[in-house]
Amino acid sequence: MGILLALSTYAVLGIFLVLLCGRLLTSWKAARIVRGYAPSPPFTPCLVLKVVGDILFLSRLLRTNDLLWIGEWLFHCTFPLVVLRHLVFFLNPVPEWVGFLQPFGIFAGYVLPLSLIYIFTVKLSREKGYFPSYNFFLLILLLLLSMTGILLRTVFKPDLVAVKGFVLGILGLSLQSVPLDFLFVIHFSLVLVFILYLPTHIFAAPLVMLDARQREEELRRVMHGEKR
């Protein structure tokens, strides 16, 4: 089982990196084509602040769907904390800042499934039954991940030393035996499925948001007859 999980991890990470590189390359080419037709306006502090607001506070979503924004913002706050908390299993020695984040990550782990349930409920009610199967699958997958994580934290506690040894063994190409915990195997397998289905466009989102803001600024200048 340990060898199977390790080989699956290498395969999933390889596929993910290929897809990610392809997405970034496509976004870069698309941006070059757009700039060829219409040069981008210069960077300004105001433009940068707007992009930061789009990324950190989901300001665009707030303007269009304030009810959904609540759940989405909670998710975007808690999910990174949960991921960062898990670095304790990937790093040896563990940096102090990772240790500092542990209580925040644990608390975020309990809030995360609530935000997912909220998002699911709002989408079903607002979109009147239309729910793309991909979004539905991703939400259910994240919910299963968070719930199995909570169970591993509170009820079916695995041997954390064995878990860390197994993970570090995969990273160091020195395979270790998988912890004898069925729920951990399920949780780890769900992580691999999530990585495989993770939408790679989110990594290009900052560039897309910046380009969109630049286009808006250029359009505003044209409409109001402003000079650069």
Regions found by a protein language model. Name each.
Residues 2-228:
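Membrane-embedded alpha-helical bundles of multi-pass integral membrane proteins
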